[in-house]
């Protein structure tokens, strides 16, 4: 069995985690600003991209109804050797209606055994979970039935709670544990994880985990909600974070793929926020105790992002396909009928120091309409790794005069002056791609600065129509640019450099090449 767990990752393919369960695990609709999330909805943000989460959990389903409605058949037909199936039922098996009810120790256990055995027959790896706790700080005889109610929070309906969390699941918690022991299956005690969390937070603070929504603040539940079963975004993210650590312990083969980020941005509702700017706003000002990590899940985020000076030490990490884009350009009119200007056209502005970005695409999609900046970097000690900068004229604006920037294995494309500005910047092992004739760089290095632009081990490439490209022209008289051990494509003119029509610039600039090919 242990060998099976680890062999799942020997093949060069993505491993899928299939999830089956009820509403506490399920993905939720996002209409009306719905704040409800199952913990499975957000689980993908805690794994690297070697792991794909496919959540089939459904609201209101028990182990019985999940089988009877054909939902299990859909899942098991998709399972391939080495895939995982996460199994969590209980809340609705407790219901009295015959379409859902099962008995612990008999029919409930039998259904769990079926899930396990059929998963193994397909070469998959089952993992059993018991039910998350209900937030029940009172002797509530209707706690089980209230799962389905999602009660409005109207006057006089607020529950009176005690101080001790009271169990509502009974023997249904033991069935997954017993079947796991019987069949040698990994078991995650989610009830204990969530019970300890809710009890530790207490009756008032624990409401922050569940769907306790004031009246009139959410279009999805305009009358508010008093719900002690279903999780909100914060609750789902908190509980998934605790659970994934337990998963790593019980299923060691998954441990290397577990990731924790302070915030997650996702278009599909699987994160804390839908936009990158919301995540930036959430970062504490001048946080000095450590870096704030933000995962941007796959998706196209059309927005203008500003990272102000107070949001220091942010790490912005993208999944493959995480694209930040906008289409402003210098001559475009703003709301006052004025031209936006080159600086005003940028998709992203970085003013804070110690910014780090990895695997993010910064794009200005305006096209060939003149100056249109994808990324404007002013903060000191900015580090970009494996990022892409897409645009045409003025793609990357290295703006800060005292800013030091490092571009590591990045891709930067454009036409005219598509890397430009005052900053000191090192480009290492980057691909610099020309989309047409023009100039790769236009530095405006201040007089007295020791360095301007340094390119080391970079590859300069171009489209077929790019035939006449200069390495640089000086935006200011003391411009500096050096290319070392770079691969200069045939599109680079032998003369290399352009003086921007000013012969006197040749007396003050510092342009150099060393051992390029």
Predicted regions span which residues?
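Serine-esterase "nucleophile elbow" of acetyl-processing enzymes
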Residues: 10-57, 73-85
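Active-site-proximal beta-strand/loop segments in catalytic clefts of secreted hydrolases
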Residues: 20-24, 55-61, 87-92, 129-133, ...
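Acidic/histidine-rich helix-loop elements
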Residues: 27-37, 57-66, 95, 99-103
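Sequence-level preference for short, compositionally simple segments enriched
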Residues: 261-517
């Amino acid at each position: 069995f242990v060998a099976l767990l680890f062999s799942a990752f020997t093949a060069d393919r993505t491993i899928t985690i299939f999830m089956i369960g009820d509403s506490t695990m399920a993905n939720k609709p996002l209409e009306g600003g719905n704040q409800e999330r199952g913990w499975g909805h957000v689980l993908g943000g805690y794994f690297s991209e070697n792991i794909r989460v496919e959540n089939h959990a459904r609201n209101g389903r028990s182990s019985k109804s999940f089988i009877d409605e054909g939902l299990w058949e859909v899942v098991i037909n998709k399972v391939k050797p080495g895939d995982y199936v996460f199994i969590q039922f209980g809340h609705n098996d407790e219901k009295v209606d015959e379409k859902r009810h099962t008995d612990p120790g008999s029919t409930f256990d039998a259904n769990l055994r079926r899930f396990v055995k059929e998963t193994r027959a397909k070469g998959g790896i089952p993992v059993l979970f018991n039910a998350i706790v209900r937030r029940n700080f009172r002797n509530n005889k209707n706690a089980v039935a209230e799962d389905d109610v999602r009660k409005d929070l109207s006057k006089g309906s607020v529950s009176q709670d005690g101080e001790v969390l009271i169990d509502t699941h009974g023997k249904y918690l033991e069935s997954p544990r017993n079947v796991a022991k019987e069949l040698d299956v990994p078991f995650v005690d989610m009830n204990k994880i969530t019970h300890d969390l809710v009890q530790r937070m207490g009756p008032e603070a624990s409401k922050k985990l569940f769907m306790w929504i004031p009246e009139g603040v959410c279009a999805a539940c305009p009358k508010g909600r008093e719900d002690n079963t279903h999780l909100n975004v914060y609750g789902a993210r908190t509980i998934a974070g605790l659970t994934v650590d337990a998963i790593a312990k019980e299923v060691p083969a998954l441990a290397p793929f577990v990731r924790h980020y302070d915030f997650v941005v996702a278009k599909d509702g699987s994160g804390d926020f839908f936009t990158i700017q919301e995540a930036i706003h959430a970062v504490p000002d001048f946080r000095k105790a450590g870096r704030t990590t933000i995962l941007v899940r796959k998706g196209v985020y059309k927005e203008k992002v500003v990272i102000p000076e107070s949001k220091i030490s942010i790490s912005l990490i993208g999944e493959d396909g995480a694209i930040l884009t906008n289409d402003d350009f210098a001559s475009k009119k703003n709301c006052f009928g004025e031209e936006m200007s080159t600086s005003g056209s940028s998709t992203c502005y970085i003013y804070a120091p110690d910014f780090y970005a990895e695997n993010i695409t910064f794009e200005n999609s305006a096209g060939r309409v003149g100056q249109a900046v994808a990324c404007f970097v002013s903060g000191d000690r900015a580090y970009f790794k494996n990022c892409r900068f897409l645009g045409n004229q003025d793609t990357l604006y290295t703006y800060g005069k005292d800013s030091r920037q490092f571009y590591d294995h990045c891709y930067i494309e454009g036409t005219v002056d598509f890397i430009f500005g005052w900053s000191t910047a090192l480009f290492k092992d980057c691909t610099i791609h020309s989309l047409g004739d023009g100039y790769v760089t236009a530095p405006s290095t201040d007089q007295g600065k020791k360095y301007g632009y340094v390119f080391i081990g970079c590859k300069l490439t171009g489209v077929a129509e790019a035939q006449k490209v200069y390495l640089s022209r000086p935006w200011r008289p003391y411009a500096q640019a050096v290319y070392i051990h770079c691969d200069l494509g045939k599109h680079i003119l032998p003369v290399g450099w352009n003086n921007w029509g000013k012969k006197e610039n040749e007396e003050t600039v510092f342009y150099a090449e060393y051992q390029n090919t």
